[in-house]
Amino acid sequence: MMVSFRNFQRIHLVGIGGIGMSGIAEVLLNLGYQISGSDLKLSPTTERLTALGARVYEGHAAANVTGSKAIVVSSAVDAANPEVQEARRLLIPVIPRGELLAELMRLKYGIAVAGAHGKTTTTSIVASVLAAAHLDPTFVIGGRVNQAGTTARLGKGEFFIVEADESDRTFLLLAPVVAVVTTIDREHLDQYSSLEDIQDCFIQFVNSVPFYGAAILCLDEPNVQGIIPEVKRPIITYGVSNQADLVISGAKLEGFGSEFRLTYKGEDLGLFHLPHPPGIHNVRNAAAAAAVALYLNVPAELIREGLAKFAGVGRRFDVKGVVNGVTVVDDYGHHPVEIQATLEAARTCKFNRLLVLFQPHRYTRTQHLWDDFSRSFNLADVLVLTDIYPASESPIAGVTSEALAGAIREAGHKNVFYFRSMQESIEHLLQEARPGDAILTIGAGNVSRASNELMLLLGTERPTHHAH
C-alpha cells in the first residue's frame, strides 16, 4: 500500500448513500480507513455503512468535514454544497469519485467495464466468474449484486473490477489492465457534443490500458466496431458475428435465463447457462465476462460455473415475485435502447401481456431522445406514464410525461395513459392486471417503490379488480 495514501486516514464522502459512493466507502472501510459521510436522507445503504463502522450524517453541514484529510464528491454534488465550501476554506483536497476509484484501482490489476448499456450487469458477471475461479476479486459496481448482497467487496486477490462511468468523463482517470466496452450510444448528451465525441472518449479509455493489457469489444455494436481502427492495444472481440474472436451461437432464451454456445478462436468451449437476467443483450454481457476470464486464462469449466451461479443484479430485470398470477418486475432502464431490450426480454418469458409503468428520468434526456422514446414501447400491451423524475434538473417547457404520452399515441400506440401521481398509475395497473400478466416498473428514478407497493396491493382483494 502506498505510504502517501495511508496518510489520508480520514476520508469524508459527500452523498455517501449514492450507489457509486457507497461501494467505494465499503472498500475503504474494509481497508481500515476512518470513513464519514453525509446524505440528504438516511437509507438501508447508509445503515449498512454505519454497521461497518462509518459515521453518517443526515443532511449536509460544514461541521461534518472537520478532521477529514480528503473530501470525495460525486458528480451530483455541486460547488455550493456547504461541505465542499468548508473543505475549500480549510484547504482539504476535494476529489471526484472517479479519481478516488482510480487511486484504489492502482493497488491491484484493474478490470474496467464501460458502455452506455449493460455495464452493471457485465461487471457483476465478471465478478461472479472470477469468484468461481477462486481469484477472490475486489469489485465496485453501480448496482447490488444479488449473490453478494452488496455493491462492493474487498477481495484478497489481485484483480479489481469496476464499472467505469462515462457519464461525466471520469472513467478517463482509470488505468485498467483490461478495458471492456459493451455498447456506445447517444447518452449523456449534456456532457458530450455528439456521438463522435463519445466515441473519441471511449478510444482514449481503451488506449489507456498498458501494452500487455487488452481491449474487449462487442463486435455486434456498430458504434463499438467503429472505434476498432483507432485502438492501439491488443483486442478481443465478442458477439454473434462469426468475425468475433469469441462467438456466441445457438442462443436459446427460456424463462428468465438463456443457454448458448461459445467458441473462442475456433475452439468450441461448449454450452453455457445464464439463469438471470433474460434477453439476448444479457447473453452478450455474459460473453463479455467470459472474454475477460479467457484473457486471464480462467478455464472454461470455471467460467461455466461462474455464469451458472449468477443471480442477477438489483433493478436489472429484478423479478420481485408473483402475486395472484401477476409477475412484478423492476428495471432501471432509462434509455430507449435499454427499454426495448427489457421489453424484448420480457416477451421471451411467455407472459400473457406486458403492463408497463414508466417514469422518465431527467428532462434533458427526455428532450434529447424524444423521438426514440416515442417508438420504444411497441411491445408494451398497456403503457402508463407518470411524471418525469427531475434528478436535480429544472423543468424544460413542453417536456412533460403528458406530452410524451401524446407523442407515443401519435406514433401508433393504442394503449397509453398518463397519470400525474404514482398512486393513480398504480391503481390503473391494478385494475388492468390479470393472471398471467407481468407488470414492469421501468426507470432510473424512484419508480421501484411502485413495484414494492404493487406486490402488496396485488395480494389484497379490491372490488375494482377484474372478475376472472
Walk through the language-model features, giving the residues of each.
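N-terminal leader/targeting and accessory segments in enzymes
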Residues: 1-100, 222, 244, 249-250, ...
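Active-site beta-alpha connecting loops in nucleotide-dependent enzymes
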Residues: 7-19, 24, 34-40, 313, ...
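Short acidic/histidine-rich motifs immediately flanking catalytic phosphotransfer sites
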Residues: 65-70, 158, 434-437
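Short, flexible loop segments at boundaries between secondary-structure elements
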Residues: 385, 459-468
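Glycine-centered, small-residue-biased loops immediately flanking beta-strands
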Residues: 213, 381, 437
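Adenine nucleotide phosphate-binding catalytic loops in nucleotide-utilizing enzymes
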Residues: 9, 14, 49, 186, ...
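Short acidic low-complexity segments
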Residues: 55-67, 150, 421-424, 429
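Phosphate-binding loop of NTP-binding sites
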Residues: 4, 27-30, 50, 64, ...
